[in-house]
Amino acid sequence: MSPTAEESLSFSCRIARTENECSRYFSLRREIFCAEQGLFASDDRDAWDGLATPIVCLVASPRDNPDAMPRLAGVVRIWEEAPGDWWGGRLGVAAEFRTAAVVGRRLIQHAVGTARAWGARRFRATVQKPNVAFFRRLRWDSIGQLELLGRPHDLMEACLDRYVPTDEIRGIPGIAGQVAAKGTTGKGERSSAELSGRDAA
């Protein structure tokens, strides 16, 4: 898809709330982080998914088929590690929507804006090196370097005052946590020593 065609589409970001949305959310994560990038063998789900809020970016149904299921363009998750201390991770964009950076930008804006609406005083993420420049353009600062899953990352922090709070209503993790639990009994699970708030993607 050309950048012009991508920019002409109608994208919307929101919390994934139904079982279908959550299943598609995890499916796209597996496609990106397991099959494509090879960061995980077969499943990238972990213990953080029981706490995290999943966010999806959807493409509006075409006018000639308004009842069609919206296409899933991208995903991200956010969670609160300590009061006011938020993290984002598993940011991924479907291959067909990577030409104009619209989806990644929308997801980051919605993720940070939602965390800010829910009381975030700090929002961080570990970012793979090829994506650091993109995050800097969105007003993130690099505050450290580390290696995760054999790949170099920057530890980055968002400038919160650059992000508009969303109107998302905070709820207790429910369906997403239940869907995640179906896949955290084996290869996707991480030890407590790894659950330091740092996400590999």
Annotate each predicted stretch with a short phrase.
Residues 93, 99-113:
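Conserved acetyl-CoA-binding loop-helix of GNAT-fold acetyltransferases
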Residues 1-14, 65, 116-117, 129-201:
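Terminal substrate-recognition subdomain of acyl/acetyltransferases
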Residues 51, 84, 149-153:
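Short acidic/glycine-enriched loop/turn segments that link adjacent beta-strands
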Residues 56, 65-80, 84-92:
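Conserved beta-strand in the GNAT
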Residues 20, 83, 129-133:
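Short alpha-helical
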Residues 88, 123-127:
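Conserved hydrophobic beta-strand within the GNAT/NAT acetyltransferase core sheet
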Residues 52, 118-120:
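Short, high-confidence coil segments that cap the C-terminus of an alpha-helix
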Residues 30-67:
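Active-site rim helix/loop that mediates acceptor-substrate recognition in acyltransferases
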